[in-house]
Amino acid sequence: MSSFISLFTSAIAFGTIIMFGALGEILTEKGGHLNLGVPGIMYIGAICGLISSFFYERGGGTSPFVGMLLSLIACFVGSAIGGLIYAFLTITLRANQNVTGLSLTIFGGGVANFFGASVSTLSGGVGQVGGDHTSSAYCAKIPFLSGLGTFGKLFFSYGFMV
């Protein structure tokens, strides 16, 4: 039973990420576009958030709330830039939506890989970049509700983004 609970909680946490991207794609399709570049836009936003969190904490910042706020703003800005690139290419230049979207997916993955390796090198080349203060703000749970046994673990053991 414990492995089922762990599987279910992981599915909810990782499914939320896919849900955010799918919601954006649904809104795009309501506007008449097929944006296959959603994963690339998500990569760009994620690496922007990681970089802002990394440099905030490296500069001596210790407030989890400020680190979380900066990383969220950077994610939004990075994703907006990715969306603007797609919009400029498909609307202004009338490029093929399928080709542009797939190119943006490849581009976003490459950008995230390049800057992720650069940040990893700056952090000592350990392969994992830690944002201890910022990640504690994202993982904050409601203490009373998350301790309600199986029910609390299934429904209240996630951060505020889920």
What are these language model-derived features?
Residues 23, 32, 38-41, 120, ...:
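Short capping/connector residues at structural and topological boundaries
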Residues 26-48, 69, 91-104:
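Short, non-helical or kinked segments that cap or interrupt transmembrane helices
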Residues 26-33, 58-62, 95, 118-125:
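Transmembrane helix-loop junctions in multipass membrane proteins, especially transporters and channels
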Residues 27, 51, 55, 84, ...:
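Membrane-interface helix caps of multi-pass small-molecule transporters
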Residues 61-111:
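Alpha-helical transmembrane segments within multi-pass membrane transporters and channels
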Residues 108-162:
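Transmembrane helix-bundle core of multi-pass membrane transporters
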